[in-house]
Swiss-Prot record:
GO terms, biological process: intracellular protein transmembrane transport; protein import; protein targeting; protein transport by the Sec complex
Binding site for Zn(2+): 839, 841, 850-851
The encoding gene: secA
Keyword Phosphoprotein: no
Protein name: Protein translocase subunit SecA
Function: Part of the Sec protein translocase complex. Interacts with the SecYEG preprotein conducting channel. Has a central role in coupling the hydrolysis of ATP to the transfer of proteins into and across the cell membrane, serving as an ATP-driven molecular motor driving the stepwise translocation of polypeptide chains across the membrane.
Cofactor annotation: Zn(2+)
Any single Pfam family the record assigns to this protein: SecA_PP_bind
Length: 862
């Protein structure tokens, strides 16, 4: 109450921020007459003066913001016949300040972006504008290029349909580059697999504006971009696990100390499955194993867990669809098909086994990054969306981004009605159809939002039965998305859309529709996130248009059933609600919103938790990529690095074969064998007589230096340096890929440390640090071994870079272009685990000290 009183007197923090920006709007408006009276050439000349001041360092962007915004506004009037509204100027300033501008649907975010884009492109460092799909990237770039070109800026677009690096490089070399989040991220990963700086396509990460920022930085936050290559892992375990899962009986969850009946219970809140004691016994019998949870059966137990999830938590046409005998993910937030992406940890293979289609091979990660860590690389990050305030805490904590709600140019006239809640889904379905019929009879357009393909098909069939013409927009036909959405505001139109399919395309209405009450939005169930519901509501009432929105719910909807149904059901029972009747109450609507807040909180904690783990890997990634970039620099002294590595290798190998600390006893037989095997160099025991430990290390280093120089003496210095650089890069890349694999194994088993009263995150940081130290040493020592062992003639030396690029290209062509995350280990994978990797069983020991003890010995070279 006291807080509300303070807000009434002083206004909210958002109100105060907006007032500050309005003061500057007045100053910009005062300049309008000045620039309006200039000719085109004079206006361009004025702009060039400001640009020179930025490039010379005489002034910074904030110093010239008022003039530049006024010039951009005038340019918009001349080239597009569009004038930036005052509230759009505020949006532009918010973006320039590296914040999120929350602007309602139809408020012209595309035009708003031109203001900070132009201002920040003046430095010549490049500006990126990110959208959610190719259509929007191309459309926005083409529409706004008139402003940019008038002011002397080049505009490029990065599209997934472009096959060549040349096209991408040309786009990135432009002053302003539009594209999708996926393409920007993948180009970054691919750039860090190149063998020369000239082949890279991206420039520095200067300033980025992310359109639909909530979709990309929140909804997609758990979806890493992965470039992966094929691996040879057995898939039989998924088939066996699927057969066993089909024979297991589902039981009902009970509170301890009672024991659940059945073979397993499903926890829908946490999206998990728990196998009961009876279920374990049955599974062991069906698999023909004594102990399902013994270390040798750990992979099989995991595959059974995924099979049970596939059958009980993932529905066809809700979470995935079958197309051309392939399992394709349905994006839970947009309803679009996520072609090329695969569920992680073997779940996708479990779904393929469930649907009896070909089980695709698991893959090995070559490079990966999350959107969270990719976009945090930019010097300045900003975003636009119609819905951000509900996630303001997450934007602040994860990305250090403040959210500013921008007032609408014309007040919103849309009526947001309270929810109608029914006891059963069938009652709700019938009520929705009746409401559609009423609106359709008078010609009022209706947009029906559904949460899944399955639900959209239900309404499609019911409307077809009633002979009501309509369009269905879901993952199965998203190719026609923009056209269907554009027509959704026409008289008599009925459009069924899965979630927020068609986002980014405005639904425009004419005067006749305005007289009928505008577009009618009907939500058929609440989403887990209030933000997604707000996006659906926001399709109506653009730029002061009238409109109506209402949600129709039932106690059988997933959200209410799992998180809030009991309380609402008791309210309905007390009120004596009969079958077919609904309840409309602010109390019930608040109860629904509280259920949504619970889910949002769970998801936020989940994303935050995942980021804590990913930050560990991200620091390592940045270190490796930074070092890789140093190697690509022609001025980098690779020969000095090799000499340093030879010295470290010599010290390391000499220590390995010392029988005591004095150095008087050295196992020279094994030392000679190792040096001959790894460095193709013969050494004599006499060379080391009467030397101290340090002197012996130096002597070995000197011998290897001489041997290496002699080996490479027939090559020209320039060629030699290039060979050294490429071979070093190849070693770094190979070791890094194996390290990513080891990190995946570590992450898979680290959760079990919690049972030993240890914090899994702390343990993960410690273990991953140790793995990284091993990686650094392996890069040093493996590069030495490769440089000593490689044999080639002059022609081969000249073609080395081309060959390396060809091999890289093959890897990229066979890679998975998008992934939910790296898949888990296949059955019998213990045989393939590197000896120094953490054991997959989760014991915390290295594989060679755990399940790898019985593996092959390494002989005298160990």
């Amino acid at each position: 109450m006291f807080l509300n009183t303070l807000k009434a007197v002083f206004g909210t923090k958002n109100d105060r921020e907006v007032k500050k920006y309005f003061k500057r709007v007045v100053q910009i408006n005062a300049l309008e007459g000045k620039y309006q009276n200039l000719s085109d050439d004079e206006l361009k000349a004025e702009f060039e003066k400001f640009k020179e001041q930025i490039l010379s360092g005489e002034k910074n962007e904030n110093d010239i913001l008022n003039d530049v915004f006024a010039i951009v506004r005038e340019t918009g009037k001349r080239t597009l016949n569009m004038r930036h509204f005052d509230v759009q100027l505020i949006g532009g300033m918010v973006l320039h300040d590296g914040k999120i501008a929350e602007m309602k649907t139809g408020e012209g975010k595309t035009l708003v972006a031109t203001l900070p884009v132009v201002l920040n492109a003046m430095s010549g460092k490049g500006v990126h504008v990110v959208t959610v799909n190719d259509y929007l990237a191309k459309r926005d770039a083409e529409q706004m290029s008139a402003i940019y070109n008038f002011l002397g800026f080049s505009v490029g677009v990065v599209l997934s349909s472009q096959n060549s690096d040349i096209e991408h490089k040309q786009a990135y070399d432009c002053d302003i580059t539009y594209g999708t989040n996926n393409e920007f991220g993948f180009d970054y990963l691919r750039d860090n697999m190149k063998f020369s700086k000239a082949e890279k396509v991206q420039r520095e990460h200067n300033f980025v504006i992310v359109d639909e920022v909530d979709s990309i930085l929140i909804d997609e936050a758990r979806t890493p971009l992965i470039i992966s290559g094929p691996t040879n892992r057995t898939l039989d375990g998924y088939i066996k696990a699927n057969e066993v899962a089909k024979q297991m009986q589902k039981g009902e969850a009970v509170l301890p100390p009672e024991k659940p009946e059945g073979d397993f219970v499903v926890d829908e809140k946490n999206r998990s499955v728990l196998i009961t004691e009876a279920g374990i016994a049955k599974a062991e019998k069906l698999f023909g194993v004594e102990n399902l949870y013994s270390l040798e059966n750990a992979i099989l137990a995991h595959q059974l867990d995924q099979a049970l999830k596939a059958h009980n938590l993932f529905e066809k046409d809700v979470h995935y669809v079958l197309r051309n005998k392939e399992v394709i993910i349905v994006d839970e937030f947009t309803g679009r098909l996520s072609e090329g992406r695969r569920f992680s940890e073997g779940l996708h293979q479990a779904l393929e086994a469930k649907e009896n289609v070909k089980i695709q091979e698991e893959s090995q990660t070559l490079a990966d990054i999350t959107f969270q860590n990719y976009f945090r690389m930019y010097n300045k990050l900003a975003g636009m969306t119609g819905t951000a305030q509900t996630e303001a805490t997450e934007f602040s904590q994860i990305y250090s981004l403040d959210v500013i709600s921008i007032p609408t140019n014309i007040p919103i006239k849309r009526q947001d009605k309270d929810d109608l809640i029914y006891k059963t889904q069938n009652e709700k379905f019938k009520a929705v159809i009746e409401e559609i019929k009423k609106a359709n009879a008078k010609g009022q357009p209706v947009l029906v939002g559904t949460a899944s393909i399955e639900r959209s098909e239900v309404f499609h069939n019911m409307l077809a039965k009633e002979k009501i013409p309509h369009h269905v927009l879901n993952a199965k036909n998203h190719e026609q998305e923009a056209l269907i959405i554009q027509d959704a505001g026409k008289k008599g139109a009925v459009t069924i859309a899965t979630n927020m399919a068609g986002r980014g395309v405005d639904i425009k209405i004419d005067d006749e529709i305005r007289a009928l009450g505008g577009l009618y939005i009907i939500g058929t169930e609440r989403h887990e996130s209030r933000r997604i519901d707000n996006q659906l509501r926001g399709r109506a009432g653009r730029q002061g248009d009238p409109g109506i929105s209402r949600f129709y719910l039932s106690l059988e909807d997933n959200l209410l059933r799992i998180f809030g149904g009991d309380r609402i059901k008791s309210i309905m029972d007390r009120l004596g609600i009969e079958e077919g009747e609904s309840i409309e109450s602010r109390i019930v609507t608040r109860a629904v919103e509280n259920a949504q807040k619970k889910v949002e909180s769970l998801h936020f904690e989940s994303r935050k938790h995942l980021l804590e783990y990913d930050d560990v890997a991200n620091e390592q990634r940045k270190t490796i990529y930074r070092y890789r970039n140093e190697l690509l620099d022609e001025n980098y002294d690779i020969r000095a690095k090799i000499s340093q590595n030879i010295a470290e290798y010599s010290a390391n190998v000499m220590n390995d074969y010392m029988l005591d600390e004095s150095g008087s006893n050295v196992n020279f037989e094994n030392l000679k064998a190792k040096i001959l095997y790894e460095c193709s160099t013969q050494i004599s025991e006499k060379d080391f007589e009467n030397l101290s430990v340090i002197e012996m290390q130096d002597k070995l280093s000197q011998i290897l230096e001489n041997s290496y120089n002699e080996k490479m003496s027939r090559l020209e210095i320039k060629e030699l340096r290039n060979i050294e650089r490429i071979l070093y890069l190849q070693v770094l890349d190979n070791v890094w890929r194996e390290h990513l694999y080891q990190m995946d194994i570590l992450k898979t088993g680290i959760g079990l440390r919690g049972y030993n009263q240890k914090d899994p995150l702390v343990e993960y940081k410690k273990e991953s640090y140790n793995l990284f130290l091993e990686l650094v040493n392996r890069i040093k020592f493996d590069s030495i071994k490769l440089l000593f062992s490689v044999q080639f003639n002059q022609q081969e030396a000249q073609n080395l870079e081309n060959k390396a690029n060809e091999e890289n290209e093959k890897l990229l062509q066979s890679s998975v272009e998008m992934g939910a995350s790296e898949d888990n280990l296949g059955e019998a994978e213990f045989k393939k685990v590197p000896r120094n990797a953490p054991c997959p069983c989760g014991s915390g020991k290295k594989f060679k000290e755990c399940h790898g003890k019985s593996g092959p010995k390494q002989g005298i070279l160990a």
